[in-house]
Amino acid sequence: MTDHRLLLDTHVALWLDSGDERLRPSTRASIDGCWKSDGTIFLSAVTAWEIALLVDTGRIDLDIPVDAWIRRFLERPGIEAVSLGHEAAARSYQLHHLEHRDPTDRLLIATAIELGCPLVTYDERIARFGARHGRQYKFAVAA
């Protein structure tokens, strides 16, 4: 899927930054296609928070402090920070009543809905949510 605007899930942002092989060629092509079309790749404040939490709990290691990593990532051409809006925060609570209960993922789903762009993720629960409710919520998953 090639779109002119994409929101990255946390693991995708980390894999993109590190050149991780888990980032499939088709996903890389979608991201590259977005860049080549002068599109925008969004990094959510929720993702920045989750990365900080993962570092703090020892689940991941970065080569530089979290705030420096985020600044470096956002300095790439075509990458834009997106704040958590009030509408997305409220919508994420509404998603609580569905089968997807992870609050971080619900916030990212709601942000993608608010932005009107696909969420690039390999999270199977998010993909299932997209398959079941994508039309209703105008939500798409790209991976």
State where each predicted segment sits.
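Acidic, PIN/NYN-like endoribonuclease modules and their adjacent C-terminal/linker elements
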Residues: 1, 109-143
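Short, well-structured N-terminal submotif of metal-dependent ribonuclease cores
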Residues: 1-43, 57-72, 142-143
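A secondary-structure boundary/capping signal
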Residues: 9-10, 47, 122
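A generic structural signal for short hydrophobic patches within well-formed alpha-helices
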Residues: 13, 48, 89, 126-127
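Residues that scaffold the ATP/ADP-binding catalytic core of kinase and kinase-like folds
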Residues: 15-17, 54, 91-95, 129-130
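General small-molecule cofactor/ligand-binding pocket signal
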Residues: 42, 82, 138-140
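Phosphate/NTP-binding elements of NTP-utilizing enzymes
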Residues: 51
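Active-site neighborhoods of divalent-metal-dependent phosphate/nucleic-acid chemistry enzymes
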Residues: 63, 76-124
